[in-house]
Swiss-Prot record:
Disulphide linkage map: C70-C146, C188-C259, C212-C233, C286-C355, C311-C332
Domain Link: 166-261, 266-357
Alphabetical GO biological process terms: cell adhesion
Keywords: Disulfide bond, Extracellular matrix, Hyaluronic acid, Immunoglobulin domain, Repeat, Secreted, Signal
Domain Ig-like V-type: 48-164
PROSITE patterns given in the database record: IG_LIKE, LINK_1, LINK_2
GO-annotated cellular components: extracellular matrix; extracellular region
GO terms, molecular function: hyaluronic acid binding
Localization terms from the record: Secreted, Extracellular space, Extracellular matrix
Family per record: Belongs to the HAPLN family.
Name of this protein: Hyaluronan and proteoglycan link protein 3
InterPro entries: C-type_lectin-like/link_sf, CTDL_fold, Hyaluronan_bind_Proteoglycan, Ig-like_dom, Ig-like_dom_sf, Ig-like_fold, Ig_sub, Ig_V-set
Length: 359
């Protein structure tokens, strides 16, 4: 396995507690976390309570349903079943608080917050306490703990849920480096996306994302992925990797942002029209076709997961004009696949339009 590099660009020569070399920090610990061995165990009265979950991350997509597996047993096995209390909660990440998901005691159960009406305990087998989660949302991605409580003893296991999606850089209509952290969060939400995590950006870099503009991530750090080192992007002397400026002030500092859009439940399409349209006409045309004008996140997801390939620029909901290319060809932009952009043209300029219809 080749060595992976994380580079911290900092005006300070060193930071206490980090191994530094020539002012740059290298690490192959990409996430700073592990799921352990997939189970927990505890001993009481000579009997061991064991909770088992999966060691592998689960992958799903927005709008889908998923089951987070969790089982428990006793060693040695008990002759008769015991009453247990089960609790599921989502762990804290990137400064967000822990979230209670579901508590079950016998036939009584209670779900919490945004999980109400979307979760239930699955008990198809004896000593199964898996969590069924419906209508997946972007914010459902993360680590969940399954805890089984038997009297004074409790044991737990972790399950990691990831939504399939695509990371894309996003820039304000005012130009480069115009978004503080809160504006970056809003910008991604308006595009049907959320601010990407470092893990999502790193995975996108592994898949070839190369972008020389620094952008906010979910933990309020500012980073950018480089596949081909070059002078304006950290210099030729640095290895490929994700460059980091570290944490930045939520309000005072301004950058672009990396957004994460989940795989689509619906369909994005280029609306065939005998004439080109202004932005207002484009919105109305999608509505007349029983759809709505596509967001940037929806267009990227359609390009990534549905293979949308069209060499015609079209309006999007944010007032930008873009087009998706899966198979690069003459007169359709650079030689690499991607979503091309014309920026934010005058709203009276005429283009096609990309519409989105939900299945």
């Amino acid at each position: 396995m080749s060595l992976l590099f994380l580079v911290l660009l900092s005006p300070f020569p060193c930071v206490l507690g980090l191994p530094f070399y020539n002012g740059f920090y290298y690490s192959n610990d990409l996430s700073g976390r592990t799921l352990g061995n997939g189970y927990g165990e505890g001993l009481f009265n000579g009997v061991k309570l064991v909770v088992e979950t999966t060691e592998e991350s689960l992958f799903s997509h927005q709008g889908a349903s998923v089951t987070l597996p969790c089982h428990y047993h006793y060693e040695p096995a008990l002759a008769s079943p015991r009453h247990v209390r089960v609790k599921w909660w989502k762990l804290s990440e990137n400064g967000a608080p822990e979230q209670d998901v579901l508590v079950v005691i016998g036939q009584r159960h209670r779900s919490f917050g945004d999980y109400q009406g979307r979760v239930q305990l699955r008990q198809d087998k004896q000593q199964e306490v898996s969590l069924e989660l419906r209508d997946l949302r972007l914010e459902d991605s993360g680590r969940y703990r399954c805890e089984v409580i038997d009297g004074l003893e409790d044991e737990s296991g972790l399950v990691e849920l990831e939504l399939r999606g695509v990371v894309f850089p996003y820039q304000s209509r005012e130009g480069r480096y115009q978004l503080n952290f809160h504006e970056a969060q809003q910008a991604c939400q308006e595009q049907g996306a959320m601010v990407a995590t470092f893990e999502q950006l790193f995975r996108a870099w592994e898949e070839g994302l190369d972008w020389c503009n620094a952008g906010w991530l979910q933990d309020a750090s500012v980073q950018y992925p480089i596949v081909l080192p070059r002078q304006p992007c950290g210099g030729l002397g640095l290895a490929p990797g994700v460059r980091s400026y570290g944490q930045r002030h939520h309000r005072l500092h301004r950058y672009d942002v990396f957004c994460f859009a989940a795989a689509l439940k619906g369909r994005v399409y280029y609306l065939e029209n005998p004439k080109k349209l202004t932005l207002l006409e484009a919105r109305e045309a999608c509505q007349e076709d029983g759809a709505q004008i596509s967001t940037v996140g929806q267009l990227f997801a359609a390009w990534k997961f549905r293979g949308l390939d069209r060499c015609d620029a079209g309006w999007l909901a944010d007032g930008s004009a873009r087009y998706p290319i899966v198979h690069p060809r003459l007169n359709c932009g650079p030689p690499e696949p991607g979503v091309r952009t014309f920026g934010f043209p005058d709203p009276h300029t005429r283009y096609g339009v990309y519409c989105y219809v939900q299945h």
